[in-house]
Amino acid sequence: MGGIFGTISKKSCVADLFYGTDYNSHLGTRRGGMATYSEDKGFVRSIHNLESSYFRSKFEPSLNKFEGCCSGIGVISDTDAQPLVMNSHLGQFAICTVSKIANMEQLEAEMLSRNMHFAEMSSGKTNTTELVALHIIQGKTFREGIENVYHHVKGSCTMLILTTDGIICAR
């Protein structure tokens, strides 16, 4: 299990993102991550291992690097290191997911047979969030890509996508 949080503000969103993501800490104990966007800084991301420490103690010392960003997503995950920052024909975006994909191995094999690759590994397995992101970028738009995910995935998948224009939520 895990939890995700997203926020957009007219001023810095860092405090809201930090506390909103931390609120989900009871849902996962493996990894925590945040990604923000601003025109000045672009995408800023941080991921920490939470297996031996709490979200707050890991992220609090480095919150200043996110300062000035007005949109962001955060995740507490019991599986994958995330959010991931991608660059594709859809533009740059950050993505985090909470999912239980029953046909993960099948989808992975299909992607590999089409000469796709996976750059992120989690405990020796393909990163689920990267698999979802690769299905999204198969679409001509984010909407088509998200529909592609739900057309192929057996199981559940909730996602937040941080773009240069805002946040897309899908479940």
For every predicted segment, state its role:
Residues 1-171:
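Conserved short alpha-helical segments that host acidic/polar catalytic motifs at enzyme active sites
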